[in-house]
Amino acid sequence: MRQELIERFTRYVKIDTQSNEESHTVPSTPGQIEFGKQLVEELKQIGLIEVTMDENGYVMATLPANTDKDVPVIGFLAHLDTATDFTGKNVKPQIHENFDGKAITLNEELNVVLTPEQFPELPSYKGHTLITTDGTTLLGADDKAGLTEIMTAMNYLIHNPQIKHGKIRVAFTPDEEIGRGPSHFDVKAFGASFAYTMDGGPLGGLEYESFNAASAKLTFKGNNTHPGTAKNKMLNASKIAMEFHSQLPAEEAPEYTEGYEGFYHLLSLNGDVEQSKAYYIIRDFDRGNFEARKNKIKQIVEKMQEKYGEENIILEMKDQYYNMLEKIEPVKEIVDIAYDAMKNLNIEPNIQPIRGGTDGSQLSYMGLPTPNIFTGGENYHGKFEYVSVDNMEKATHVIIEIARLFEERA
């Protein structure tokens, strides 16, 4: 299995599948379509049936049940795209067998070094086989590690029919990194009662709480005149934007929060005297606090509109996704099975809230409760990204054990 994981993963990461937020096509980039087509062929070769790829690039397939028991249909999902934060073109994965726990020089020429000082978890991987970047790109373990693990688990189950399981559906989705993953996902066609995204990080990660999320776009309009004769005439849009921002709690920002704490995050601010635009994201685990945060923004805007004119401050706010805990709690047994699967494999489950969202956040509200499971990667979205092959192997066995436990408990 180990060599199969390495071969499959290193092949996948060399395919450029970065999504593109500016694009209006589905999926947002052609690389995802090409990758999807390759996965369709590979799924067929492995022996899965009902292998499809729709016009939006969603790949689905079935591993038929090999038991007479009435087992719920379960699904495993991963996403095709990689993050937009750093280049994902020409990825050159580097394999480090029996890692010594010390600093790894990723790129001598550019002096890119993965150090324990910067990444304190690094020495804990001593003895593992690590796959890193060459220091010039991201790796794409998010989420090609998940794709690799699902493929490898399906192949293993086909070749080990003594492991009894119900019907399993797999799906590979585009554009997760730009928040559009579930936008065109056909829950009915997928036909699973529950699913798991293989899209987590380090060993043991089991996540079924996510942020409630909203975005706020603010447009501030000013009036530009010659600064020499501007008294009582000029209205500086950039200053109005700064005034707005100053009324948000400074300590409730990503750089000051952790755990279950929510925040307001100014993603971008640009403009001039005539017009300025600010883009925020609002995040909180608690629905009441989430609504209160949105109301605070509305109240600040309304107060400032009284001062500067309604037409000069325009707010566009929309909800993005909600905390999946609300939809997963009624079917908590799916979390319990994943927990027990890890325990059976001597993996200590690490249950943490996701300070972000996964496809599962939205899918859970679309009728497909979907917790998230670790894949074995670290430092996603940048040149210091790496993955432990040892922990990819463990994640693959978690998939297999979940399938076995669902059948055993049916």
Swiss-Prot record:
Where does this protein hold Zn(2+) 1? H79, D142, D199
Q: Which UniProt keywords apply?
A: Aminopeptidase, Cytoplasm, Hydrolase, Metal-binding, Metalloprotease, Protease, Zinc
- Which residues span the membrane? none
Matching entries from InterPro entries are given as:
ArgE/DapE_CS, Bact_exopeptidase_dim_dom, Peptidase_M20, Peptidase_M20_dimer, Peptidase_M20B
Q: Name one GO biological process term.
A: peptide catabolic process
Major localization class: cytoplasm
Q: Which Pfam families match?
A: M20_dimer, Peptidase_M20
Q: Does the keyword Cytoplasm apply?
A: yes
GO cellular component terms listed in the entry, alphabetical order: cytosol
Q: Which locations, inside or outside the cell, does it occupy?
A: Cytoplasm
Q: Where is the active site?
A: D81, E176
The family assignment reads: Belongs to the peptidase M20B family.
Q: What does this protein do?
A: Cleaves the N-terminal amino acid of tripeptides.
| UniProt-recorded name of the protein | Peptidase T
Q: Which organism is it from?
A: Bacillus cytotoxicus (strain DSM 22905 / CIP 110041 / 391-98 / NVH 391-98)
